[in-house]
């Protein structure tokens, strides 16, 4: 049916960006801590509920990626908003959406200062993590990967305990250095395939057009 097909094509977008939409709405909330906590919990539970659509409608006998959406984003270079999941990323997405409301509940009585900022960062990080697990375009993947860095570093630096600033700076620096190697690998793959699309790159490797263990793999490993 058309309605079901339409949902199949947008469900990953809904699951990915619902937490971000919630974070943006939280920015306009008055500083009433209880209301902020309740709203963050509702958004995280809604995201988890939507993510359950994925395992229920996932066809285990089918190979390749499912719930795919592929739209041209940037013409030059050739960047697509391409998202999809396989049997591994499926459960990583569900695990992320399951753990987020637990994080909200666990922090309910332990976070007393900057409550709004805490939950905004938590919801932004949820969107970034889901994006990492569902992106099939390496440029979009890299964007989401870097997007996890800022909220995570701020959560450590603001809401951590002893030596929290040192820990946040160390985390930020190590992740940024590693990301340079990852970016180098992604650019190498684009230079040799003309595409950032994971499916296209995989097909070229399987067909022998690219070596199975190119130099870029070493940079990805370091990243």
Predicted regions, residues:
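Transmembrane helix-loop-helix hairpins at membrane boundaries of multipass inner-membrane proteins
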Residues: 1-11, 26-120, 194-212
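Hydrophobic membrane-targeting signal helices
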Residues: 17, 21, 25, 54, ...
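Alpha-helical multi-pass transmembrane bundles of energy-transducing inner-membrane proteins
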Residues: 33-34, 117-124, 128-220
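Hydrophobic residues within membrane-embedded alpha-helical segments of Major Facilitator Superfamily
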Residues: 18, 22-25, 43, 47, ...
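Short hydrophobic "helix-edge" motifs at membrane interfaces and signal-peptide entry regions
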Residues: 8-10, 21, 75-78, 126-128, ...
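Tryptophan-centered motif/residue detector
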Residues: 17, 71-75, 108, 133, ...
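Structural signature of hydrophobic alpha-helical transmembrane segments
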Residues: 6-18, 85-96, 138-151, 217-223
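Short glycine-rich loop/turn motifs that provide flexible caps or phosphate-binding loops at active sites
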Residues: 21-22, 86-88, 95, 156, ...
């Amino acid at each position: 049916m058309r309605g079901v097909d339409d949902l199949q094509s947008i469900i990953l977008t809904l699951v990915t960006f619902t937490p971000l939409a919630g974070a943006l709405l939280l920015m306009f909330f008055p500083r009433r801590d209880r209301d902020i906590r309740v709203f963050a919990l509702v958004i995280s539970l809604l995201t988890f509920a939507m993510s359950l659509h994925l395992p229920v409608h996932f066809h285990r006998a089918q190979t390749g990626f499912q719930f795919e959406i592929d739209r041209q984003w940037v013409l030059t270079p050739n960047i697509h908003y391409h998202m999809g999941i396989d049997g591994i990323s499926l459960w990583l997405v569900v695990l992320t959406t399951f753990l987020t409301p637990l994080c909200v509940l666990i922090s309910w009585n332990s976070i007393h200062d900057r409550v709004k900022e805490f939950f905004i960062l938590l919801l932004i990080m949820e969107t970034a993590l889901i994006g990492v697990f569902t992106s099939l375009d390496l440029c979009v993947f890299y964007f989401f990967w870097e997007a996890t860095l800022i909220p995570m570093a701020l959560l450590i630096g603001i809401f951590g305990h002893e030596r929290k600033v040192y820990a946040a700076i160390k985390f930020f620096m190590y992740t940024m250095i590693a990301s340079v190697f990852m970016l180098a690998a992604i650019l190498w793959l684009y230079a040799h395939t003309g595409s950032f699309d994971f499916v296209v790159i995989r097909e070229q490797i399987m067909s022998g057009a690219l070596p199975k263990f190119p130099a870029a793999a070493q940079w990805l490993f370091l990243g």
